[in-house]
Swiss-Prot record:
Source organism: Streptomyces kanamyceticus
Lineage: Bacteria, Bacillati, Actinomycetota, Actinomycetes, Kitasatosporales
This protein's name: Kanamycin B dioxygenase
Job of this protein: Mediates the conversion of kanamycin B into 2'-dehydrokanamycin A during the transformation of kanamycin B to kanamycin A.
Family the entry assigns: Belongs to the PhyH family.
Cofactor(s) recorded in Swiss-Prot or TrEMBL: Fe cation
UniProt xrefs under PANTHER family: PHYTANOYL-COA DIOXYGENASE FAMILY PROTEIN (AFU_ORTHOLOGUE AFUA_2G03330)
InterPro entries: Fungal_Metabolite_Diox (IPR051961), Phytyl_CoA_dOase-like (IPR008775)
Highest taxon listed in the record's lineage: Bacteria
Annotated GO MF terms: 2-oxoglutarate-dependent dioxygenase activity
């Protein structure tokens, strides 16, 4: 189902000056995530930040595409691409956003930590991905609370034309035995059962928004019918007990990253960090 705007039942409207949610707004955000598995926070980030990140990722794209093995998620045109981790492009309002952490701490606990700093590029002419989840249910067939929340940052206006993601609200709680294949893709019979009850939605997402979603939410990348790449920055917050490799960050940001109570699972290194040819253990879509 294609919509003209983010649906009201999934959305909170904010401004870049909002540093905390009042109790009523926090309760609403948590209720949206619990019921639907996806929350759209519009107006969160200043466009001067997203503009710089977008430009840097687009500048890197030719080098990514020259690699012998381009990191592709499922089908052609969906390229996993990490953003630069230079000090000048690591923004506290993005990496340590107080409203984002207020929400993820409320769901995952005060020791939750970000362990992903990645992204993707949906290229013109891309194919349709299979419906999938990014993170598995830990105990198949058993209902359990979330252990991770994906934090997605559109770096341009996402439109129906340029490949705004398809989401399946409420699917994060669906955990029957044998629902998924070995890649985390939803089996066709399960898709049709869910479609009859709650069909998927797609909608424009304005730049400056942040999308928080349960890592188990069904979703897929769709074809980019525009003439320009569609970049996304992606992070994932996990409960402190879930083991993940650390993000590689330059030691020049250690003081403000490590000094924050908004935790980042990071390894700090001297000099430049190779963000283009390192391992890509996460299938961020």
């Amino acid at each position: 189902m294609a919509l003209a705007a983010p649906p009201g039942e999934l959305t909170l409207a904010l401004t870049p000056d909002d540093k905390t949610l009042d109790p009523a707004s926090l309760d609403r955000a948590l209720a949206i995530l619990a019921e639907h598995g996806i929350l759209v926070l519009t107006g969160m980030l200043r466009t001067r930040l997203t503009d710089q990140l977008r430009t840097a990722m687009l500048d890197d794209l030719p080098e990514v595409l020259r690699q012998q093995d381009v990191p592709t998620n499922f089908v052609p045109g969906h390229v996993q691409q990490d953003p630069p981790v230079r000090e000048s492009l690591l923004f506290p309002d993005v990496l340590l956003n107080p409203v984002v952490y207020q929400i993820t701490h409320a769901v995952l606990g005060a020791d939750a930590r970000n362990a992903v700093y990645s992204g993707n590029m949906n290229l013109p002419g891309s194919h349709e991905q299979p419906v999938h989840l990014d993170e598995p249910h830990l105990w198949p067939g058993i209902s359990h609370p979330p252990y991770c929340l994906c934090v997605d940052v559109p770096l341009i206006d996402f439109t129906l034309e340029n490949g705004s993601t398809e989401y399946w609200p409420g699917s994060h709680v669906l955990n029957p035995d044998e629902c998924y294949d070995e890649r985390g893709c939803v089996l066709p019979a399960e898709l049709e059962r869910r479609r009859a009850v709650a069909p998927p939605v797609r909608f424009p997402i304005p730049v400056g928004s942040v999308v928080i979603r349960d890592g188990r939410l069904w979703h897929r990348g769709v074809p980019n019918l525009s003439a320009a790449p569609r970049p996304l920055l992606a992070m994932t917050h996990y409960t402190e007990w879930f083991d993940m490799p650390p993000i590689q960050l330059p030691d020049t940001v250690k003081s403000w990253v490590d000094g924050s109570d908004r935790h980042t699972h990071a390894h700090f290194v001297a000099g430049d960090v190779d963000h283009l040819t390192g391992d890509h253990p996460f299938a961020v879509r």
